[in-house]
Every structure is written in structure tokens, then in C-alpha cells.
């Protein structure tokens, strides 16, 4: 599935990662909320810590980009950060289109996933697959084609830049490359 060039593209370029984005007060709030969830790991406990954030997005309609909104459920202490990130993506020169976006999703393994704590976001999963460690098996989604498929997230895209600026990790560098995934 992946050529050597493609494999290199899956590794997150740290040039957009902003270590200065870490705010100790914000991190303490996030840690406090995640600790509450960990103390009683269940959907009800986690759901009580989440908020729905309305975000500006570009949609594709008949091949044209049109303004719209979407909602993503995240941990309340990172809601403003999420709003800022998606506003930057929306205002970026790329006008990156978002077909679907997901955040909080309780998993049966509890806090084994950042989605269970509301600190992860997936964007356009059909066009931004998760690839197994073998580099060939697509676990979720379809072919990753930045520059060809408008929904695929390129490594130098406005999406990667905005999340990196705010100190989020891109799943592209995971052992199971997860192109759709960003986490705090």
C-alpha cells in the first residue's frame, strides 16, 4: 500500500509542533478532569465532563466549497482550544473541507483511548486511514491521497499546522499511522 515516499509522509513533521503551546494552568485543568474520569471510568462520568463545540467548516457541495458548521464533543477544558484550531483551519488559505469530525467516544477499554477522555479528534476518517504496523493493511478508512482527494490531510496542510501550533499530536507518526487523528 505505501511506497517508501508515502511511509516518510506518515511521520509527523515537527516543524509545526509548538512546544510553547503548553499552558501549565490549562494542562492542570485537563489533568483534573481526566483524573475524575479515571476514578470512575464509565460513559456517564466521562460524558459529564464533555461539551459540544460548534466549529466553522468548509463543506464541498457540487464541487464548490461552502461555509458551514459542525459540532464536536470534547473535554470542556479544551473547548476553547478546539474552537480556535478549527477557526484557524477555516480561515486558512487552503479552505480545507471537512466532511465529518468526531471527538469524544467512550470505548469499552475506558481510558485506553484519548477519545474516551474527549482529548482526541478524528477528521474525515474515510480519506485519512489508520494503517496497521505492517504499512499495508488499512484498519479504518480508505486510501490516503493528499493533493488528489480534497478530504485527505496533507503533512503540510492547514490542519496539521493549526493542531501543531496548539501543541496537539498528529496520529500520522503512530506505529499504526492514524492520519485522521489528533490528540491533546
Label the predicted regions:
Residues 1-42:
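N-terminal low-complexity, Pro/Thr/Ser-rich intrinsically disordered segments
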Residues 2-3, 113-184:
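Catalytic cores and adjacent binding grooves of peptidoglycan-active enzymes
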Residues 10-18, 79-90, 146:
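A broad, low-specificity signal for short, low-complexity segments enriched in glycine/proline
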Residues 18, 57, 105, 143, ...:
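Residues in intrinsically disordered, low-complexity segments of regulatory proteins
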Residues 27-99:
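Active-site acidic/histidine clusters and adjacent loop/turn architecture
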Residues 36-44, 109-112, 154-155:
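Intrinsically disordered, low-complexity boundary segments flanking structured domains
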Residues 66-76, 110, 144-152:
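Second-shell loop/turn segments in exported
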Residues 83-133:
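Active-site-adjacent loop/helix surface patches within enzyme catalytic domains
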Amino acid at each position: 500500500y505505501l511506497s517508501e515516499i508515502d511511509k516518510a509522509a506518515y511521520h509527523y513533521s515537527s516543524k509545526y509542533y509548538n512546544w510553547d503551546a503548553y499552558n501549565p494552568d490549562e494542562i492542570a485543568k485537563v489533568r483534573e478532569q481526566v483524573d475524575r474520569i479515571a476514578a470512575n471510568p464509565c460513559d456517564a462520568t466521562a460524558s459529564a465532563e464533555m461539551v459540544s463545540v460548534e466549529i466553522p467548516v468548509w463543506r464541498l457541495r457540487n464541487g464548490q466549497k461552502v461555509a458551514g458548521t459542525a459540532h464536536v464533543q470534547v473535554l470542556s477544558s479544551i473547548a476553547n482550544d478546539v474552537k480556535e484550531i478549527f477557526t484557524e483551519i477555516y480561515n486558512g488559505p487552503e479552505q480545507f473541507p471537512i466532511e465529518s469530525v468526531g471527538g469524544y467516544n467512550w470505548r469499552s477499554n475506558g481510558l485506553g483511548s484519548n477519545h474516551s477522555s474527549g482529548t482526541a479528534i478524528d477528521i474525515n476518517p474515510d480519506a485519512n486511514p489508520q494503517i496497521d504496523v505492517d504499512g499495508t493493511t488499512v484498519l479504518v478508512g480508505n486510501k490516503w491521497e493528499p493533493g488528489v482527494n480534497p478530504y485527505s490531510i496533507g503533512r503540510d496542510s492547514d490542519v496539521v499546522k493549526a493542531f501543531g501550533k496548539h501543541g496537539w499530536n498528529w496520529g500520522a507518526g503512530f506505529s499504526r499511522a492514524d492520519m485522521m487523528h489528533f490528540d491533546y
